[in-house]
């Protein structure tokens, strides 16, 4: 595949349906490095059956919200990749917030755990936005999301992940590089 230019992406978005993952397929293989939303869309669709009614509505509405938001703003932002990438993340965050991703995660811990898998390719800014949206929830929801993610990392990755997550310095300790 040859990378798609921003104008190719814009043309594709203009013709994409607002249901399904077609809009997000347009973002793949772009010269602006906007890959990742298609994988998230596919994960949501593949796990949709495991969500409760509120979760199923969230899946449908959040994907539609992001697709419509990106499509409606693409022509204002397509000229500069950084602005385009930021716009996609902002639309994603707005949609998750407006549609209460925290409530959905709280009432669908298993299903959200299936969605929050470690992506095959790092870095993935849109996966990070999804995780940040979930980690901004209440402590109980964050604990469920973290536990699900750590469980899916497997034993080889669990220890380094926990080490990076924990702070081992005592509060009174001033043994940093500047002391």
Curated annotation (Swiss-Prot):
Glycans are attached at residue 29. GO terms for molecular function: hormone activity. GO terms for cellular component: extracellular space. Its main location: secreted. GO terms for biological process: calcium ion transport; intracellular calcium ion homeostasis. It holds the Pfam family Stanniocalcin. It comes from the Eukaryota. Disulfide bonds join 12-26, 21-41, 32-81, 65-95, 102-137. Produced and secreted by the corpuscles of Stannius. Keywords: Calcium, Calcium transport, Disulfide bond, Glycoprotein, Hormone, Ion transport, Secreted, Transport. It is found in: Secreted. The keyword Repeat does not apply. Belongs to the stanniocalcin family. Homodimer; disulfide-linked. Its primary function is the prevention of hypercalcemia. Upon release into the circulation, it lowers calcium transport by the gills, thereby reducing its rate of influx from the environment into the extracellular compartment. STC also stimulates phosphate reabsorption by renal proximal tubules. The consequence of this action is increased levels of plasma phosphate, which combines with excess calcium and promotes its disposal into bone and scales. This is Stanniocalcin.
């Amino acid at each position: 595949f040859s990378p798609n230019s921003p104008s190719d992406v814009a043309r594709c978005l203009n013709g994409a349906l607002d249901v399904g993952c077609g809009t997000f397929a347009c973002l793949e293989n772009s010269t602006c490095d906007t890959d990742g939303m298609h994988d998230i869309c596919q994960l949501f669709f593949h796990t949709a059956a495991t969500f409760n009614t509120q979760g199923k509505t969230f899946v449908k509405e959040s994907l539609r919200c992001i697709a419509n938001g990106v499509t409606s703003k693409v022509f204002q932002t397509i000229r500069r990749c950084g602005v385009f990438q930021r716009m996609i993340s902002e639309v994603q965050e707005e949609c998750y917030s407006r549609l209460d991703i925290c409530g959905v995660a709280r009432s669908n811990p298993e299903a959200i755990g299936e969605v929050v898998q470690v992506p095959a390719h790092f870095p993935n800014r849109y996966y990070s936005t999804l995780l940040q949206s979930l980690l901004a929830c209440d402590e109980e929801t964050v604990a469920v999301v973290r536990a699900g993610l750590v469980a899916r990392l497997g034993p080889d990755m669990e220890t380094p992940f926990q080490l990076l997550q924990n702070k081992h310095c005592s509060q009174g300790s001033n043994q940093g590089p500047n002391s």
